[in-house]
């Protein structure tokens, strides 16, 4: 049987994270009451995992094992979203190589807040829900975008002069021209727009709103409260809103604008930390570079749903860097390593090792397929085919 090693992982305490979801899932106390946004599982240089080599006390660097057992071309994350993440997109391979080379040649520090490219890799990703999750992903059809904005103007006609230049581009130009014009709104106009949206009358919404759902209005008002001078508060009008139930997943290719808004889940991506942000964040926003990587075409994300009662399931994607598996019961994990697994329910035994909810482990390459015993459920990430 392949060698298996318990993992010790590092956390990202971004302000959008939850103080409770990850600590409770792992069974640890959050003594400092800090937000736990992400737990990284893998060998990305931004937060590389360690492995327990003998029992639980001695540890080594996962990268050293990977050199022996084969490449680990993906990064596996646990995400806990209390506040909305930025609207963002990730580059394709060519864009990542070009952007990384440019920033390296400019001698821009890797830790600089204006750094966009931390590496030269693309970053397609899949997000799988562990709780109900809300996100936005992909541009709507131009006609649908116009319908949404026209309904906004029915509720708030005073915004017509601010929004008409961008909407005019959508009618006679392209989606990219609309997007650029929307983000060229002056700061004063942005603040004016946000103030009106914050104070919008609920009865007026009920009377005039038929296309925009109550949940979308709540999102927009929430964005206006959190980011009172940000044109990205209007993103629910031009991006698809998606709701996931536990075990459901969406695949987000490079170049697709998206934002995770709330919930708890797992994310697998190509081993990269390249992010281009467009708003809804105090972090660095680079609209010009974001537009360079965006695919300005409508994109409706497909929700991947396992069959009811499935004890194992593969979340297929076109990405060769990773596959995501769900395994439960007494199933044999038939993929060869390397792989990273995280237990989400119950307890399992494999060989002399016991893993409980919240535990993660690395399966090295080589040896026979791994069998798990017990009453458990886990997710496993491994290289694609």
Predicted features along the sequence, with ranges:
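A short beta-loop-beta micro-motif enriched in histidine and acidic residues
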Residues: 34-36, 71-72, 82, 121-123, ...
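A short beta-strand-loop-beta hairpin characteristic of the jelly-roll/cupin
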Residues: 50-72, 138-139, 226-245, 334-336, ...
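C-terminal, non-catalytic macromolecule-binding modules
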Residues: 263-314
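Ligand-binding loop in jelly-roll beta-barrel domains
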Residues: 79-84, 88-94, 119-123, 129-135, ...
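Conserved SET/PR-domain catalytic core that frames the SAM/AdoMet-binding pocket
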Residues: 240-260, 366
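Conserved short histidine dyad/triad with adjacent acidic residue
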Residues: 308-311, 320-336, 354, 365
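Transition-metal
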Residues: 1-209, 282-300, 324
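A charged, amphipathic alpha-helical module
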Residues: 181-246
């Amino acid at each position: 049987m392949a060698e298996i090693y318990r993992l010790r992982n590092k956390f990202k305490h971004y302000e959008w994270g939850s103080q409770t979801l990850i600590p409770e899932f792992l069974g640890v106390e959050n003594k400092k009451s800090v937000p736990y946004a992400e737990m990284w599982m893998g060998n990305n240089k931004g937060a590389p995992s360690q492995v327990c080599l003998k029992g639980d006390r001695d540890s080594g660097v996962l990268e050293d094992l990977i050199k022996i057992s084969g490449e680990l071309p993906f990064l596996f994350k646990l995400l806990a979203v209390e506040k909305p993440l930025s609207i963002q997109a990730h580059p394709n391979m060519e864009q990542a190589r070009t952007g990384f080379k440019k920033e390296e040649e400019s001698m821009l520090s890797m830790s600089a807040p204006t750094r966009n490219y931390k590496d030269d890799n693309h970053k397609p990703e899949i997000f799988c829900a562990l709780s109900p999750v809300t996100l936005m992903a992909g541009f709507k059809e131009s006609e649908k975008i116009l319908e949404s904005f026209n309904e906004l103007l029915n509720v708030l006609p005073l915004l017509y002069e601010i929004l008409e230049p961008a909407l005019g581009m959508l009618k006679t130009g392209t989606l990219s021209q609309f997007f650029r014009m929307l983000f060229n709104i002056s700061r004063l106009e942005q603040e004016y727009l946000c103030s009106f949206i914050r104070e919008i009358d609920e009865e007026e919404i009920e009377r005039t709103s038929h296309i925009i759902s109550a949940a979308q209005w709540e999102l927009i008002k929430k964005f206006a409260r959190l980011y009172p001078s940000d044109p990205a508060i209007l993103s629910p009008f031009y991006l698809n809103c998606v709701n996931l139930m536990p075990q459901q997943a969406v695949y987000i290719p490079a170049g697709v604008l998206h934002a995770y808004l709330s919930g708890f889940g797992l994310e697998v991506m190509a081993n990269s930390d390249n992010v281009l942000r467009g708003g809804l964040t105090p972090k660095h926003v680079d609209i010009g570079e974001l537009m360079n990587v965006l695919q300005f075409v409508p994109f409706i994300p497909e929700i991947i749903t396992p069959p009811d009662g499935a004890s194992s399931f593969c979340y297929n994607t076109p990405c060769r860097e990773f596959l995501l598996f769900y395994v439960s019961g007494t199933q044999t994990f038939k993929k060869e390593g390397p792989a990273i697994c995280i237990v989400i329910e119950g307890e399992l035994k494999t060989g002399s090792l016991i893993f409980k909810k919240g535990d993660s482990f690395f399966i090295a390459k080589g040896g026979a397929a791994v069998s798990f015993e017990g009453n458990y459920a886990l997710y496993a990430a491994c290289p694609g085919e």
